Amino acid sequence: MALVGPRIWGPRRDIYPLLLLLLLLLLLLLPWVPAGLVPPETPSVCASDPCAPGTKCQATESGGYTCEPSELGGCATQPCHHGALCVPQGPDPNSFRCYCVPGFQGPHCELDIDECASRPCQHGGTCQNLADHYECHCPLGYAGVTCEAEVDECSSAPCLHGGSCLDGVGSYRCVCAPGYAGANCQLDVDECQSQPCAHGGVCHDLVNGFRCDCADTGYEGARCEQEVLECASAPCAHNASCLDGFRSFRCLCWPGFSGERCEVDEDECASGPCQNGGQCLQRSDPTLYGGVQAIFPGAFSFSHAAGFLCSCPLGFAGNDCSMDVDECASGPCLNGGSCQDLPNGFQCYCQDGYTGLTCQEDMDECQSEPCLHGGTCSDTVAGYICQCPEAWGGHDCSVQLTGCQGHTCPLAATCIPTFKSGLHGYFCRCPPGTYGPFCGQNTTFSVVSGSSVWGLVPAAASLGLALRFRTTLLAGTLATLKDTRDSLELVLVGAVLQATLSRHGTAVLILTLPDLALNDGHWHQVEVTLHLGTLELRLWHEGCPGQLCVASGPVATGPTASVASGPPGSYSIYLGGGVFAGCFQDVRVEGHLLLPEELKGTVLLGCERREPCQPLPCAHGGACVDLWTHFRCDCPRPYRGATCTDEVPAATFGLGGATSSASFLLHQLGPNLTVSFFLRTREPAGLLLQFANDSVASLTVFLSEGQIRAEGLGHPAVVLPGRWDDGLPHLVMLSFGPDQLQDLGQRLYVGGRFYPDDTQLWGGPFRGCLQDLQLNSIHLPFFSSPMENSSWPSELEAGQSSNLTQGCVSEDTCNPNPCFNGGTCHVTWNDFYCTCSENFTGPTCAQQRWCPRQPCLPPATCEEVPDGFVCVAEATFREGPPAVFTGHNVSSSLSGLTLAFRTRDSEAGLLRAVSAAGAHSNIWLAVRNGSLAGDVAGSVLPAPGPRVADGAWHRVRLAREFPQAAASRWLLWLDGAATPVALHGLGGDLGFLQGPGAVPLLLAENFTGCLGRVALGDFPLPLAPPRSGTVSGAREHFVAWPGSPAVSLGCRGGPVCSPSPCLHGGACRDLFDAFACSCGPAWEGPRCEIRADPCRSTPCVRGQCHARPDGRFECRCPPGFSGPRCRLPVLPQGCNLNSTCKDGAPCEGGPLGTNCSCQEGLAGLRCQSLDKPCEASPCLNGGTCRVASGIFECTCSAGFSGQFCEVVKTLPLPLPFPLLEVAVPAACACLLLLLLGLLSGILAARKRRQSEGTYSPSQQEVAGARLEMDSVLKVPPEERLI
């Protein structure tokens, strides 16, 4: 390479880029060309302002000017000073007026007003006049615009240490707290200056005080003035005595204690005085005295605290445990064991069957479980007994019983195998009522009422009777076993079993098994035994503990065999007898079975009978009593007869206004009297019964104000509670004892007396019905009847009657017709009822009905009240003003309150009425924290209650527990609860809501929701007005307060679904001021705002779950499985089907289906997929390939989509900037850059051209300036690039 010499520029080649740069520079500097370079315009003729003041110059086209009047007039010269406003005045062009700013005056506002002339500064302040205002310079102690305010020098709290500041004029004074002084209480007073501490005590100054340090002085007290008593602090331990000295003390110790303060407890046990392992106990230990485990007797005392005691182990004794004790001396070995004495102990040698330290334990041979095959082991002394199951026997149940093999028992008998003395056998266990080797003999027989059977049995030293029986009778003799001296009787008394042992006819012992009725007709097993002076009664019954009841008692001497009623050495037994009727079986005396053929008397084999009370034979609810072979009906009054079909006839007194009466003659009735009868009447007064002797009444029973009263001579009246004049039948029963009765007299009057005036004292003659009159259970008939006996009992005698009507007959109460306004009358007993037409109601159809006329407009409904109506409706409230009602015209009692509401407000008022009379005249109900709260006349609802702010309807009912009481608890029923909730505290009534001074009742304060029916007592609140032109005639009702706003009728929640808040097509459901969205399958969330993940619950049993756009899922199954959830295995298919191997792969059939041999690069059950699909890079535009279940998937990069990422996304995006405002400058910048780049390229090309290639100087260069100056300059050698 040749050397490069200096660049040589030609005069014409370098001018072009310079010209181009100059051009660009001129274009850039053109907007900033100075205005001076532009030729000036010709000056106007008006520039010199040639016109007079008040006129303005106007140039003309000819180059001259004219002076015209100016709109500024005289203001053109700015005559007004100090910022005043100048306004021209009138036609005179030189006139003007100045409007001064505040603080100046004069024609030209040239005068400054002196604001200090009025002396505004107070308290000697100096006034400084300023423009438009003044300024006060205040003296010390004052401040403010006019020095009007006195400065509070105490505001800066100058007084320290809690001092009090007293403000003055321009000053302050501090009142210091005790212990401080100074102008600002900054000085702490030194109380030690007076040297208050005596006896050399050191004084320490405190705030408002001092403290004396009396250490090492021998003195104490606040000023060290008292001598210290060293013994006062009880320095001596262990109850030692203290001797006081000056600044010293001395302790006198008890024996066993030492030390300066007697604090050392001398250890007497340190020398180990107790031998043979004895425990040494010091007497100075207080824990060893008193208590349950005390070692030393009595209470602890320091006077006896010296010394020790040895607690010796077993086998040793003495003060130091040096003596060996003979443990066998006390005979410790039990149950025949022999004792051997040992050092510090003994050894017992036990008899067989016992063990333990003292042979106290009976060895349980059953612990080894010797009984086989489920046998039960019972321990005995030195042995055991096995209770074997039925199939096994032997000592340890090891022998299988075979006695029943090849043998059968007839009927219902059970074969029981046996094993005795090594031999197998069997016996038949017979069911009850049978006997014999093969249970072929019947032991059951019957005994009828009024007869008995008997037999003889051998006598024995002991006595036992066992039998089974059944009966339905309450009482009767079951069995009697006796000899000439003694008898044992088994009876039923009130259906209860009882055993009686008698001697010489006198009962010696009676045993009873109470509370078990045995007359139920079932079989019962009973046993009674007399053995070793004890009588025992047993009963097998399911009502007994363990199904066995036992009663027993001692007998002085048991019965002995003596000369019996039969042959010598026998007992007589009697079964049945008297009223007993029933059956017996398995009767045994001392184990001897009595068969029916061995008995004498009327013996009926078997136990056959028909249920006499089936079907029920007793009418009118009569009780059927089973008497074994027949029945008896216990009839309710007033029925009687064998089957209760006959009714005792009633007697009607006073029918049609007649005067009725009946009488009976009496004889001796005994000391007691019971009167009973049926009564039916609607009259509140009248004579019922009167016992009299001639004209003197001894006992009178009568009606007074609907109550039954009984009055006798010398006794206070008796009143039966309740009312008896309601027209219903009542059974009346009166009982009198001997102390309540005197001579009743000879006659009984019923319903009246034969002279009506004689009954006025007791309400007059009776009107009504009397039936089944009985005296001491003796029936007194009002009418003769074939049912009555022909002869009267000795206590009574037939009397006479007047104007009685048989049967209980009613008056014709519908004649004349009592029903008004077309009502139909219907007769009831001595009363009537009316069926009214549509527009009338009431007992006699006299009250008008308003609601059929539809006086209320929908949605309100009409509700009838006395003499009128009320329009009730549901109403909607939206935080508006409350609805106000008043009950000033209500006089009836308000028994309670009902209220229905629904809301979602957690804080809202429901109802309120507050008076100045106190808590018992207030009521409020509200929703607090979502629960019901309130105060009802002083009773407070318990909190918290159930949540009610849930948008559902809730119904509240409040009532007093005792309505008539002055103060009572209030009870709350919420939403129809069966059990009320009691409010806390006693409350008054709701009387403050009614009458002339009624307290206004406010509904729905700050309430959003609906109110339903609201009622106080029987008066609903009229939330809706009646139809126009309709007026309710109700005398008592609540009315809306004048000016109370009208309510919005109907219950409507807010428009929560309009517009619908549910996204993505969800359906909005209105839940009353709340909503719920029913989302489609692809969405979820409160507003369907969350895309649902159908794969969240892993629905696919196998394979992978993929979410579909419609919100459902799709399971992509692995090979070999199919179905919506990949649950089902793919069924085998043959090679001859269409769905076999793909791409010509050979197919091989087998028992499990087809098997395809896939070509290279293919895979799958049918060779339907690529073996390694991602190796071919199927994903375009930078997508990522992955394999799932043998199929490839492409995960595309941003901006692409599709199966192979081949689709370019063309979603338009909004421009974040204005296009034109950015594009034009950008284009200009690009153009400029292009020009600069072009220029740079040209220069670079020129440079390359100059520095590369072969250099040939041109003609101009040869004749250039450098050659022309050869004679002057030394030209360097030329260099050229070769």
Curated annotation (Swiss-Prot):
Record keyword Transmembrane present: yes
Cysteine-cysteine disulfides: C75-C86, C80-C98, C100-C109, C116-C127, C121-C136, C138-C147, C154-C165, C159-C174, C176-C185, C192-C203, C197-C212, C214-C224, C231-C242, C236-C251, C253-C262, C269-C280, C274-C310, C312-C321, C328-C339, C333-C348, C350-C359, C366-C377, C371-C386, C388-C397, C404-C415, C409-C428, C430-C439, C583-C607, C613-C624, C618-C633, C635-C644, C769-C808, C814-C825, C819-C834, C836-C845, C1010-C1051, C1057-C1068, C1062-C1077, C1079-C1088, C1095-C1105, C1100-C1115, C1117-C1126, C1135-C1147, C1141-C1156, C1158-C1167, C1174-C1185, C1179-C1194, C1196-C1205
Residue spans crossing the bilayer: 1222-1242
Disruption phenotype: Embryonic lethality due impaired gastrulation. Mesoderm formation is disrupted, and cells do not ingress. Instead, a single layer forms, and the embryo fails to properly establish its body plan, leading to embryonic arrest. Conditional deletion in the developing retina leads to progressive disorganization during late retinal development: retina show progressive thinning of the photoreceptor layer and sites of cellular mislocalization. Conditional deletion in the dorsal telencephalon leads to defects in the maintenance of the apical complex.
InterPro entries assigned: ConA-like_dom_sf, EGF-like_Ca-bd_dom, EGF-like_CS, EGF-like_dom, EGF-type_Asp/Asn_hydroxyl_site, EGF_Ca-bd_CS, Growth_fac_rcpt_cys_sf, Laminin_G
One GO BP: ingression involved in gastrulation with mouth forming second
Pfam families: EGF, hEGF, Laminin_G_2
Highest taxon, organism lineage: Eukaryota
Tissue: In the adult eye, strongly expressed in the outer nuclear layer, containing the cell bodies of the photoreceptor cells, and in the inner nuclear layer, containing the cell bodies of the horizontal, bipolar, amacrine, and Mueller glial cells. Also expressed in some cells in the ganglion cell layer (or may be displaced amacrine cells rather than ganglion cells).
Cytoplasmic topology ranges: 1243-1282
Record localization: Apical cell membrane
Post-translational modification: O-glucosylated by POGLUT1 at Ser-271; consists of an O-glucose trisaccharide, in which the O-glucose is elongated by the addition of two xylose residues. O-glucosylation is required for localization at the plasma membrane.
Keywords per UniProt: Calcium, Cell membrane, Developmental protein, Disulfide bond, EGF-like domain, Gastrulation, Glycoprotein, Membrane, Repeat, Signal, Transmembrane, Transmembrane helix
CDD domains, per database record: EGF_CA (cd00054), LamG (cd00110)
Residue span, Laminin G-like domain: 444-607, 649-808, 872-1051
Domain EGF-like: 71-110, 112-148, 150-186, 188-225, 227-263, 265-322, 324-360, 362-398, 400-440, 609-645, 810-846, 1053-1089, 1091-1127, 1131-1168, 1170-1206
Chain segments carrying region Interaction with EPB41L5: 1246-1282
The UniProt record lists the keyword Isomerase: no
Extracellular topology ranges: 36-1221
Secretion signal, residue range per the UniProt entry: 1-35
Protein's recorded name: Protein crumbs homolog 2
Protein's gene: Crb2
